[in-house]
């Protein structure tokens, strides 16, 4: 079970974007793509088959999953634990003990 999933609100703990918040767009193995964080400029070629124009495009680059943490209700970063409730495994915030919505 992944502790961080698509759609989770996270905060960046380290790096040039430290302190920024965003929503997880994708989980790629041990990396996550966070909306508006770690944005790089990529040069795109025009493709007439797809109808795309060329130019410089902003692209969200993935961060390592250990460099982000879920945000609790108080707006603080929190680690995530796994707990069994009613025979199901649920994610629990370590700071508040609240269950994270699936």
Curated annotation (Swiss-Prot):
Subunit architecture: Part of the 50S ribosomal subunit.
Function statement: One of two assembly initiator proteins, it binds directly to the 5'-end of the 23S rRNA, where it nucleates assembly of the 50S subunit. One of the proteins that surrounds the polypeptide exit tunnel on the outside of the subunit.
Pfam families: KOW, ribosomal_L24
Keyword field contains RNA-binding: yes
The family this protein is said to belong to: Belongs to the universal ribosomal protein uL24 family.
SUPFAM superfamilies: Translation proteins SH3-like domain
Coiled-coil residue spans: none
CC per GO annotation: ribonucleoprotein complex; ribosome
Superkingdom field: Bacteria
Record-given protein name: Large ribosomal subunit protein uL24
CDD domains: KOW_RPL26 (cd06089)
Keywords from the named record: Ribonucleoprotein, Ribosomal protein, RNA-binding, rRNA-binding
GO molecular function (one): rRNA binding
GO aspect biological process, one term: translation
């Amino acid at each position: 079970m992944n502790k961080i999933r698509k759609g989770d609100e996270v905060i960046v703990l380290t790096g040039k974007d430290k302190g920024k918040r965003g929503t997880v767009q994708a989980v790629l193995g041990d990396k996550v793509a966070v909306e508006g964080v770690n944005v790089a400029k990529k040069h795109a070629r025009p493709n007439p088959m797809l109808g795309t124009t060329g130019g410089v495009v902003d692209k969200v680059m993935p961060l390592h999953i250990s460099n982000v943490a879920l945000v609790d209700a108080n707006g603080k970063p929190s680690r995530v634990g796994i707990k069994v409730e009613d025979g199901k495994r649920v994610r629990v915030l370590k700071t508040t003990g609240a269950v994270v919505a699936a």
